[in-house]
Amino acid sequence: MNEEKKALVELMLGGSEAAFDELYRSSSKKLYRMAYFITGNRSDSEDILQETFVKCFLYRDKLREPERFEPWLYQILVRTAWRVEKRKKSRSELSFEGILDQEKDHLRAEWIQEDEREKGPLGAVLEAETAAQIRDALSKLDMKYRTVILLYYYNELSTKEIAGVTGTMEGTVKSRLFKARKLLKGILEAEDIVEGEKERGICHG
């Protein structure tokens, strides 16, 4: 967090509505996208966004460290989104249509690279895949796996921060990331978006 944003957070914590409004303007777009990727519903995402910021202001005294503002805000949003999704559990599939084309830059293969941020087996997505195809693949993941992928690769939170956001142990987050990457890789390979090991001529044993 830069010093300017930290100063705004400190002012907001002191009750400044002007600072709160500025934080809303600077953060709402990214938070809305996050809510949309979790729910796949624009109306729900707008409601989740509004509820997140209402809670942010009402419970601002619970934020002890200004530099922790973003993970704290994601915690509110993710848990609110999960609650909404649990209420609508009967819905069988999510639609991810209609996100702005500019999302493509945010949805590249770096989401699904290895922990060390080196180019992993899904690196071909960077050149070969579109945002829409990746969104479709993500929509097929269970919500808990989709969420950790988004928080880690898209929002660039650490596994420790994600643990705080999701209310789980850091080891659980790492396990979910590993499984999510494996599942996502399988989906992309099954749809011929990236090559599997057999197609690349790789064999084991």
PLM regions with names:
Residues 1-2, 7-11, 93-97, 133, ...:
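C-terminal edge and immediately downstream basic/flexible tail or linker adjoining helix-turn-helix-like DNA-binding
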Residues 5, 10, 14-17, 89, ...:
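Amphipathic alpha-helical segment used for protein-protein interaction
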Residues 9-33, 37:
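A short, charge-rich alpha-helical start-of-domain segment used by transcription regulators
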Residues 24-25, 32, 42-59:
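Conserved RNAP core-binding helix
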Residues 78-82, 134, 145, 154, ...:
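DNA-recognition helix of helix-turn-helix
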Residues 58-65, 78-96, 104-105, 127, ...:
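Arg/Lys-rich amphipathic alpha helix in sigma70-family domain 2
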Residues 26-29, 37-38, 141, 150-157:
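Short helix-capping/turn signature of helix-turn-helix
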Residues 33, 47-54, 67-79:
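Structural recognition of an alpha-helix C-terminal capping motif at a helix-to-coil junction
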